[in-house]
């Protein structure tokens, strides 16, 4: 489950400009445990919080910026959404992950590549060492102008190295070497989507061998990524969500469904209802295991060796979650 939450939730925008007052961030009844309960009930296998979006506002009291919960009046500047989020995830036995946007429309050093890259590594280190362990770090590739009108050259190898050093088991997703973006925000993979890709091909270099590089399909349950009250009646239908499911999970990809918390700091009742209906529909569709007790056959056997016959396969279906 993706959770887009931040100053945009309160300014009714999708992309903030970094000039918003930290005081606009003021959830009246933040309940991260409610997030986890709803995610577990719907069958999600991971939760990813937007710790910092393009506006640069941090949902933790970062010591590297003045644009964070520390500078807001919410909980007298003592609030920490990331802390409440990871604590709720651990209490509910839900893997926690975070989204961290390299684009920062507030940070003055953005566009001064070496200086900003160190700033970004500092914040990345702060999150990993203060709140870990994390299951995944999700990098957005957006690279617009900063407050000085300059663009930034991201030091991806440095970012990856920091994660590998501090959180070696965490996946690095989207702008990363472990999980790739499917290429759209509609939650739809290509027919025949393969997890085996040419090594280096995504970087524009000559392919040398092949690697395991699965696709992730991100999409929001609403038209927008952040919560907007005007979209309460525009939550995707069960039929639409099922179509997305079969065109993502059914095409060998991970489905990352965004469910944005509202201004109170909770998942909206409208979204909860749709998640409940979606889960019920999936349970009904898959209540009968069509493979149980069926014989296995293979038209091609490795080296024509009967030891590799399909009937000897040890793989089995599991009830593991297939969405994040």
Residue ranges with predicted function:
Residues 2-314, 318-321:
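Mature catalytic domains of secreted/periplasmic carbohydrate-active enzymes
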